[in-house]
UniProtKB/Swiss-Prot annotation:
It is found in: Cell membrane. Could be involved in insertion of integral membrane proteins into the membrane. This is Putative membrane protein insertion efficiency factor. Pfam families: YidD (PF01809). Residues 62-85 are annotated as: Disordered. One of its GO terms (cellular component) is plasma membrane. PANTHER family: MEMBRANE PROTEIN INSERTION EFFICIENCY FACTOR-RELATED. Keywords: Cell membrane, Membrane. Transmembrane segments: none annotated. It is a peripheral membrane protein. InterPro entries: Membr_insert_effic_factor_YidD. Belongs to the UPF0161 family.
Amino acid sequence: MKKIFLAMIHFYQRFISPLTPPTCRFYPTCSEYTREAIQYHGAFKGLYLGIRRILKCHPLHKGGFDPVPLKKDKSASKHSHKHNH
């Protein structure tokens, strides 16, 4: 699935996006963000993050720098609670 999603984004970036005026309010662009999210988080979580990003890319949102979030380290959060007795 990951390869299919990435191929679709590549097709969009290469053949469709150049035909339309730039309208994305964010850096990286929504398509690039989705590509990075899929590569970093996998097909389904990456696609979910990309859809969330696209939904907030509208004139009422100020946009700006919005990188793909890093993975949460579950083991670090379990060990970060220190007990002092």
